[in-house]
Amino acid sequence: MIKPRTPPGIMELLPREQIAFQRMLDVIRRNYERFGFLPVETPVFELSDVLLTKSGGETERQVYFVQSTGALANAAAAADEGAENGGLPELALRFDLTVPLARYVAEHEHDLSFPFRRYQMQRVYRGERAQRGRFREFYQCDIDVIGKDALSIRYDAEVLAVIHAVFAELGIGDFKVQLNNRKLLRGFFESLGVAEGELQLAVLREVDKIDKRGADYVRDTLVGEGFGIPAEQVARILAFVAVRSNGHADALAQLQALEGSVGASATLGEGIAELREVLELVKALGVPESAYCLNFSIARGLDYYTGTVYETTLTDHPQIGSICSGGRYDSLASHYTKSKLPGVGISIGLTRLFWQLREAGLIQGIAESSVQAMVALMDETRLDDALDIARRLRIGGINTEVQMEPKKIGKQFQYAARAGIRFVVLAGDDELARGVVAVKDLVREQQFDVARDELASTLQVELEQARAMLVAGSVQGD
């Protein structure tokens, strides 16, 4: 027999954990839709030449290629005949949702209304080295607003408001959206004489490692042979990226101080103006000032970000790292269309986030089953009645399971308890004679009688009370 096992780098959940994961997906989807984002799905695999247009190097080494058995046989036959294999396989699994979005918008450009607001929540695949907390298959939950030729900076503020709404409803603890602008960093580097484009990008990538590797590591790297930046300039860079704001007024004050202390730079001025407008609009959108701050070290390692950048962290669990990130880019689909399509967006890596929360013991207060009631079967003669009770419960909005085979009532209770089902409905001859059913509440360990016509509404009230207590407990815990 073959040993049943999953490939490395896969998160496979038992039902009660899958319920918790699914509810997080539901919360994210609900908030994306509340802000007017439209759902999009793209194929799990794309044409290789389309998918890999913007990539190379490390990304290409992590791509999973797809080959049919027929294509494999043809390639093998060609190899036997000494022919070249024709390059990469025709298809490849997507490694993120951004490149498929670029292809999607370019392909359907004339059928879409701009600004195009899309959300996408699907699995992506990367050939990561198998290790704890790293996944080869994982969910990403993205939103993007795409403009045609131009896109107002106001959308950058709205995206931050979406981040706040999502994590406030998820209820996984206090969080902070850290905000910066790549133009701010580029303008500051220009004032130091670090103006060459490739060098700037390389420095930005190193600055983005400060929270993970520490300032000493970044200092040693920048003064080392690879960069050779004078120690005095590196010290100024590290002092600049150490800036953090504390509250809305302090954030504006930090920008004001920067505006008056650094040499003139058009790029720096643009970055300051954009950040100031985002901050003012975030306040107007009702995001509490405790939920965001300036962090001048946030750069985002990806080179296509050109303006606003975001990283979100849990205040009490910084070891988890970024739980949501993104930013502004000038042109989404330049490899696929001549149209200029600027945009702003963010991504939540939900699989990694869920795994980290579970490891930290933060996945709590979740029902053990999506089944809310089970109708017990007392004996074979009661099957039609049990099925009718279940039908009425389902019509009343109660997720209901029926025991299809009569067993000892103790075993039926035991099954319901193990399955995480709260209510067991009993309808024997005695209950039928009195026009009621008996309900066993396995959470409160109580049993009560209910009129048949009132069963669904009674259970709805009980479930609503339980949900209210859960919300109250979450608020008190905060």
Swiss-Prot record:
Molecular function as annotated in GO: ATP binding; histidine-tRNA ligase activity
Keyword check for RNA-binding: no
Keywords, alphabetical: Aminoacyl-tRNA synthetase, ATP-binding, Cytoplasm, Ligase, Nucleotide-binding, Protein biosynthesis
SUPFAM superfamilies named in the record: Class II aaRS ABD-related (SSF52954), Class II aaRS and biotin synthetases (SSF55681)
Superkingdom, natural source: Bacteria
GO biological process terms on file: histidyl-tRNA aminoacylation
Matching Pfam families: HGTP_anticodon (PF03129), tRNA-synt_His (PF13393)
EC number: 6.1.1.21
Gene Ontology CC: cytoplasm
Known catalytic reactions: tRNA(His) + L-histidine + ATP = L-histidyl-tRNA(His) + AMP + diphosphate + H(+)
HAMAP family the record matches: His_tRNA_synth
PANTHER family reported for this sequence: HISTIDINE--TRNA LIGASE, HISTIDYL-TRNA SYNTHETASE
Family: Belongs to the class-II aminoacyl-tRNA synthetase family.
Subunit architecture: Homodimer.
The name this protein goes by in its record: Histidine--tRNA ligase
Gene (name only): hisS
